[in-house]
Amino acid sequence: MAATAAAAAAAPPADPPDSSPAASSPPRPSPEELVARAVAPVKPAFLRPPLSATPPKDEGKANGGGAVVAEKKSKRQLKRERKQEQKSSSHLCIEVGKSGNVSSCKYGDSCRFSHDIDAYLAQKPADLEGTCPFTNLDQLCPYGLTCRFLGTHKDIHAASGNLSEKHEINALNKDIQKLLWKNKYKFPKASAQIKLLGLKEVIKSKPDAANDDKKVNHDNLDGNDDENKEPLCNPPVNAECDSTLCEELDRSEGEPLIDNSIPCVEPRPTKKSKVESDEIDKHGAGTLNTNTESEDPNLSNGLEPSNNSSSCRTDLITTPHLREKKIIDFREKLYLAPLTTVGNLPFRRLCKTLGADITCGEMAMCTNLLQGQASEWALLRRHSSEDLFGVQICGAYPDTVARTVELVDNECSVDFIDINMGCPIDIVVNKGAGSSLLTKPMRIKSIVQAASTVTEKPLTVKVRTAFFEGRNRADSIVSDIYDWGASAITVHGRSRQQRYSKLADWDYIYQCAQKAPDQLHVVGNGDVFSFTDWNKHVSGCSKISTSMIARGALIKPWIFTEVKEQRHWDITSGERFNILKDFVSFGLEHWGSDSKGVETTRYFLLEWLSYTCRYIPVGLLDVIPQRLNWRPPSYCGRDDLETLMISDSAADWIRISEMLLGKVPEGFTFTPKHKSNAYDRAENG
């Protein structure tokens, strides 16, 4: 022991361990290893230490609000505050604001809003930088004194009759809304077709709608009628079913609330109606005598009679054959997917400027449209630049969907109507709509047959691979859906249960396309994030007409330019900022240039920025193109603006919005509606 200690003491001292960063840190994985682990291979020069994992207390707040939780107010308090706020000087009457003349309001002293112009101008916030979007269009601003760009107006006291020209269509007519509120809008085609298919229509349009013309045109549109308490339409039920099966309706969506103790009976057509349905499948036309006088649908709905000699007759319903319908060629066209919340009209208009060919509105619920809800009808708005435009609807029952299709066909200008049978969110699935229809193929058949025969416009269907993971069902309906009446089908390569936890299954999409008839357009959907992805998926199967672009367009809307020019665009922060400017300009033109319109534009801009922050510039990557499932490391941009744009902090998104729309109101907070940062977990609906 002593000898060992002496030898150790005599030995020279060991070199101290190297404490340099290069020696202490593990070797950096290669780009190939990072890609295999679904980590974005950012160049080492742009990497930086990760920030604190705990978000600051003022995350998503403009002015770093305190820790005190505000007490929740009752509905009575909120209503009282709304009334007081309406009478405040900050809420100037719309008509007075347009013309700058107090006497222009027809309600006079009984108006609910303020008529004090001097008080309004005294408390009005300072004008925003820039010019009024309507001035740039050489048009008079419809917001007059309330515009946040008032100083740039050429004539602030112009007559309201010379206001800006409308570039948007499909607005809800007030007379039509009144008929929908009273459940007096007639659906002759849908009612006849539902009866022809052997499905029972319990609630029908109220009679004597034609005699209510004066009432429709002169009554106030408050919707507080006794008739509005009744449901618009009931689900189709078998004539042999108990009539108490569907007594109650959910007021929020109008769908049936069936007692779980009673088994739900799928509607089955009678033998006679089955023969008639087969005749429709073979010949594309059906005739039904209802022993009622023929009438103009406009006249029956209390409107001006139509001059069209080919108006619909309720005693003779002739359903158009598929060959007689307008044909839309989807082949190799750039299709912007319908996107909830962020797929609004200004965003679609922006994508059109960047190269999109086909656009589709946000998903609208059938029952809400039939009830005349203005917020739902706003989803059907179309801009004049959208030359190939469709609307997407979602419903659970044949009669509801058929009525909605007939309503849209009569009142809106669209090129095609899409039925969403792939929506995965719970509030839709729990009502029997969306992806839950994949478990009911006979219901799908009834919906498509009923809807396709009430319109001459092409009908398309959007589905997922399946409802449950590993139980693919889409291929079982692709071969028949054309015979039922659909012109195209979009297959999203994920199941409802899977959501975004894995990459889209394009092999299964190709399998579905191989089973489709030649006349049916098959559109693929899932994980298209570059022009190479689009080329690969469209050329991977000759029966794939095109590929729908969804999240890829949200993260980088210039993907349409990349596909058309066949290049990876290393876009600069300045070019991206100009795109944001265009969106803000389109938003102010759509939602308004007053204070309310500015804040609405800000909200949708922030929702969109929660997606664009996922984009990694091409010049920062060792491997291109970027993939949707790549998780970005902590990195910085090539300049301060690019670094700000790649931040996933809501406070930084608010800072960007302030660069475009001025300071946010005091106490402003923002929380994204969608979890856009879902990379490998089933979070994002």
Swiss-Prot record:
Which cofactors, by name?
Answer: FMN
Q: Where does FMN bind?
A: P338, L339, T340, Q392, K462, H492, N525, G526, D527, A550, R551
Enzyme's top EC category: oxidoreductase
Enzyme Commission code(s) on record:
1.3.1.89, 1.3.1.-
CDD domains linked: DUS_like_FMN
- One matching Pfam family: Dus
Which segments does the record annotate as C3H1-type zinc fingers? 87-118
Keywords, comma-separated and alphabetical: Flavoprotein, FMN, Metal-binding, mRNA processing, NAD, NADP, Oxidoreductase, Repeat, tRNA processing, Zinc, Zinc-finger
Which residue intervals are annotated with compositional bias (Basic and acidic residues) in the record?
209-221, 273-284
Annotated InterPro entries: Aldolase_TIM (IPR013785), DUS-like_FMN-bd (IPR035587), tRNA_hU_synthase_CS (IPR018517), Znf_CCCH (IPR000571)
Biased amino acid composition, Polar residues: 287-314
Location of the active site: C423 (proton donor)
Q: Which family does it belong to?
A: Belongs to the Dus family. Dus3 subfamily.
Its biological function? Answer: Catalyzes the synthesis of dihydrouridine, a modified base found in the D-loop of most tRNAs. Specifically modifies U47 in cytoplasmic tRNAs. Catalyzes the synthesis of dihydrouridine in some mRNAs, thereby affecting their translation.
- Which named protein is this? tRNA-dihydrouridine(47) synthase [NAD(P)(+)]-like
Organism the protein comes from: Oryza sativa subsp. japonica (Rice)
